[in-house]
Amino acid sequence: MISFNNNYRKLRKAIINEDIEEIKYIIEKDPNMIVKVDNNNHTLLHIAIMYRKVNAVKVLLDKGDNLVYVINSFPILPPLYCAIIGFCKLTRRNKISNALEKINNHKKIIEALVDKGVELTGLEIALSCKNIWLIKFLIEKGISVEYTGFFPVGVNYNTIDIDICKVLLENKIDINKPVCGETLVRYAIRSSDLNLLKYLISKGADIEKRNKYEQDPNIIEAVEKGNLGIVEYLIDNGISIDTVSIYNHKPAIYYAILAGHYNMVDLLLRRGANPFITCEGNTSLISVATQAKRNRLKLINLLLKYGVRLPGDHDYYIQPILLDYSYETYNIIHILLEHGLRITSNTTLVSTFLIIRV
């Protein structure tokens, strides 16, 4: 960090005014000025980028032998990021005076930075803004498409559409490799874009591909999103319906039941999901249904229809609903008792008796 001395102020002013001779003169007098960082973690190069001063950027890059090292050091925002953010903001606005000139200046600055050898970054911003020129430029220059970005915010997956995927595939990006941390199929699932999913599968996408160390299976992601069309299409194309979560080793049907998504559970069961998985306390999925956000009674009846019973610790089936004195709870308790529920805990027995009496 620096305290603003007279030379720094003069150089900053010269950059904003794009007074090239003055910039060169001050740098020659004090070469170290060029790599100093202000209280906002900005170098003078950042200032030149923010004011879109193309010639000033080029002079600073030419004069600063150590500048690339400094600007790629955390916590300083990489100047390429700074330029890309400004560029994308401009292209998303409709009414700006001299917009075309400003956009072109940003392009020239981005090109100058890349030519100087700064670390390639910002693809996730380009994708989130659907900026075709920038996506193509970064890929052509050799950016690692798997890199998730400077900030842990990821891509706005709703912007990944067929047009964006066509650009990526035309630029020789492997359809099954992660792009900014996610496969293209994963983006289609997360955005519930059935047309995109169909397009990707037609181009040879593997519907099972994902980051196995950090992400749940695609079928679980799709079920949690709740789009029946997406889930059914994945099943039609051979996705494994019973692949379990990396976090709790439960399959998609478990999550569908917990969310109370009756139609999703019905679809999964009709398409061959295993209803006989073991849950906490060696219980069945019926214990999960008693904890569902909605449709508890319907889900229990559906599971019973498929032959699911009440094994394991029977207190697990009843405990989640003991504080819910609703008519649905009354019916749930009755149907569980009819199908062999045995309550062994005195506390649970008393609470159940009170609900039935009410």
From Swiss-Prot:
ANK repeats lie at residues 6-35, 40-69, 91-118, 119-147, 149-177, 180-209, 214-243, 248-277, 280-312, 316-345. InterPro entries: Ankyrin_rpt, Ankyrin_rpt-contain_sf. It comes from Fowlpox virus (strain NVSL). Keywords: ANK repeat, Repeat. It comes from the Viruses. PROSITE patterns: ANK_REP_REGION (PS50297), ANK_REPEAT (PS50088). It holds the Pfam family Ank_2. Gene3D superfamilies: Ankyrin repeat-containing domain. This is Putative ankyrin repeat protein FPV242. SUPFAM superfamilies: Ankyrin repeat (SSF48403).
